Amino acid sequence: MKHVYITAKLVLAAWLIAPLTLLADEGMWQPHQLPAMADELKAKGLEIDAESISRLTEFPMNAVISLGGCTASFVSAQGLVVTNHHCAYGSILHNSTPEKNLLKDGFLANTFDEELPASPGSRVYVTEAVTEVTKKVVTGLDALKGNAFYQAIEQNEKALIADCESGGGYRCQVYSFHGGLEYYLIKQLEIRDVRLVYNPAGSIGKYGGDIDNWMWPRHTGDFSFYRAYVAKNGSPADFSEDNIPYQPKSFLKVSAKGVSEGDFVMVTGYPGRTNRYRTANEVENQFEWAYPEGKQLRERLMEIIEETAIEGSDERIKYEGLLAGLANYAKNFTSMIEFYGKSPMLAERQDREQQLTNWINQNKQRKQRYGETLSVLDGLIVQSQQHKERNLIVGYMRYTSMLPTARRLYRLANENLLEDMVREPGYQERDMIRFKSGMERIDRRYAASVDRAMLFEMIQRYANLPGEERIPAFDHAFNIGTTLDEVALNAVLDSMYANTQLDDLDTRLAWMTKSVGEFKASQDPFIKIAVAMYDTDMASEKKDKALSGQFMKVRPQYMQAIIAFNRDQGKPVYADANSSLRVAFGHVKGYSPQDGLRAQPFTRLEGILAKDTGNDPFDSPAEQLELIKQKQYGDFYLEAIDSVPVNFLSTLDTTGGNSGSPTLNGRAELVGLLFDGVYESIIGDWGYDPKTNRSIQVDSRYMLWVMKYLDKADRLLDEMELVYE
């Protein structure tokens, strides 16, 4: 099957001819698409020029930044960065001890000198350019198949990245859009000195905890502040006391006036992943197998952490971040399963595919071009699911530390034998600072007792797989026979954790430069397993890449058919989220979660009082409760609700990765921080529903209220530019 591509202009045309009224509030749009939407956006409430949102080096887009997994924004001329509390979680935990628990008590630096280094590997990424490179990635590769095609694409991407990063100080990446139909090279300034400036107490920043997670009404102060630092000449640099605050080209003003019900809002950020063009087979497997299995595994790992690490202990502090992440997606998967069961999603996907097939067969040229696409794609999907049980269990072993660390280090030793451009992504010279940071982070995220318990659980599950699904090298490494001898396994693990030296940072860093021969001679038990598993790992990876190469040939054909079909149907087309910069538009609006109930778009300070029990996670600081009782609203009062708004709902189309995204009004002033979605909208990753799709934002007025009246963060309030009109 011939590999095809279309240019950005053709994709743009695919939705341009659709009536703009169909766009509603759905869509995560690429910045270059926005000028064509100018009239509709103006009618919705956008007051700035839509063209300016497409120019990444100008306000407001150059004030919006990525943290590598979360979004954030500059809010002062001195590199002050605001994001979610849960996005700064790792840095808060990194600087916490049982004696000085910043997660519990909060933290405020009163001077620049008091600002704390963020967790190792923390970065601020400022997107400066997005360039379409489809031809440079895929031209001349039609004759290649499978692994050869995958490797050729990868090499072309590496060459583009190397050229992009040649000037230093930048991190570049090639992103695939529409399943490989388009490729874009994204260039980002990489700021490496990031410091924690302020986070409210956990009883504000994580108020409601896992109980309120994904729920409405919500009363969470999910905000924290970083600062970006650079060398005195303005270039990115590693942490140094001589570094100075970065001066961004622009920053966002923070609105103290906020928004009201019905107001226009937009969000800019880096949404992680959506699946709105996946096939019926993929939907069925994900909802009827992957989500239920993943939910159960995550809940079991949570139990292990809670059973093994006593609350308040140093071990527990180290695992709070992982615990929060596991809980977050366990609840996410629960919602996915629940609302899939209530929805006609599978039938709708099957119907869409039948309509697509009928449309293709109505035209000889279409049939010649796309006739086999869906059946070939479905065949690859079935093939990719053949070892799903084993792959899931082995994949969840990544939540342990020692075994994955040993395997990464030995892989590095092997990759170091190759020329840099031939090495696997993640093991090139450009990746070594990140690699080292990963080794450094382990110290504050690892406890042997917890790691051992999680690995024991995963090996137990692995041992219950059918014999044909087992991996001989893995069985041999852990002395697993036809049946599992748990007593023997316990003895093996006890010995491994007692005798490894990979729990020492200096040892891990030293292994980064050692030879393959030194690894083979090592007596460290985890390194011995990494060496024993290596050939099997590489053979498995080669098969996976060959299959991925086949997908990379077929998926673009499928997406081209979908785009052409949607164009004929008068439907807009936007790419699934892929962690690249996007813009979404919507309004402040409540919703009806179920028959007979109407959720208002704002929550109030008084809702905190009503929820508070004095016990975690509903244990607001006593001073905060007293301020609320006194109706100390100050400058942040909203007459329509007779209080200070805490959180608000919007129709913005967002997903994971948007956390920390600035929610802006029509003048591009910050009116909130996006931090969650309602429980009913989690399934929106697979399809937008205007009736229930709601994002949850921290209201800027609540953030400012906490800063001014509770935490006395006057230095930061004076530094930011607040707008009261």
Spell out what each predicted region is:
Residues 1-8:
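Positively charged n-region of N-terminal signal peptides that target proteins for export
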Residues 9-19:
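Bacterial N-terminal signal peptides
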Residues 20-725:
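Terminal presequence/propeptide segments associated with secretion/organelle targeting
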